[in-house]
Amino acid sequence: MAIILPELPYAYDALEPQFDAETMTLHHDKHHATYVANANAALEKHPEIGENLEELLADVTKIPEDIRQALINNGGGHLNHALFWELLSPEKQDITPDVAQAIDDAFGSFDAFKEQFTAAATGRFGSGWAWLVVNKEGQLEITSTANQDTPISEGKKPILALDVWEHAYYLNYRNVRPNYIKAFFEIINWKKVSELYQAAK
């Protein structure tokens, strides 16, 4: 059994105009597929550790040293992208009441949350991700990670994710990352965010 590249839960062009079909095709079929292939290649060297990436990345010290960085990069890349696709919706959704209340409690207002999340996504130098997570205390927190690092490795449970690698937006938005972030907020799958939030609490 190997890690499998999940199919997108919608057509490649379903998120247009916010996310264009060419970017989605390259992002899923090339970038994500490469993370899956490289993660499988690393895992094949140590079949004794299994293939549960969430468990492995929750405590990277348990990953054999010769494949540790490869799994952080590629296992993380797979988990991050598999989650990211599910957090996007072709149909515009309103934020669910439970998540809206939790955001108000944690950040004061949705606008304050959006401003802080945007700052995390804009301020991530180079490649990485912006996240809304449930931390170890059960509280909402905004964070960002470099490269394909996952908040799971810090004991946090991601409920919203934004890929800020240039490959995620450059064809459509060029170097204007803030416009890409703004577009992201128009296509969030809030039902999925709520599902993850309820499971993480």
UniProtKB/Swiss-Prot annotation:
Mn(2+) binds at H27, H81, D163, H167. It is found in: Secreted. It catalyses: 2 superoxide + 2 H(+) = H2O2 + O2. GO terms for cellular component: cytoplasm; extracellular region. Keywords: Manganese, Metal-binding, Oxidoreductase, Secreted. InterPro entries: Mn/Fe_SOD, Mn/Fe_SOD_BS, Mn/Fe_SOD_C, Mn/Fe_SOD_N, Mn/Fe_SOD_N_sf, SOD_C_sf. GO terms for molecular function: metal ion binding; superoxide dismutase activity. Its EC number is 1.15.1.1. Pfam families: Sod_Fe_C, Sod_Fe_N. Binds 1 Mn(2+) ion per subunit. Its cofactor is Mn(2+). The keyword Ribonucleoprotein does not apply. The keyword ATP-binding does not apply. Homodimer. Belongs to the iron/manganese superoxide dismutase family. Destroys superoxide anion radicals which are normally produced within the cells and which are toxic to biological systems. This is Superoxide dismutase [Mn]. It comes from Streptococcus pyogenes serotype M6 (strain ATCC BAA-946 / MGAS10394). The gene is sodA.
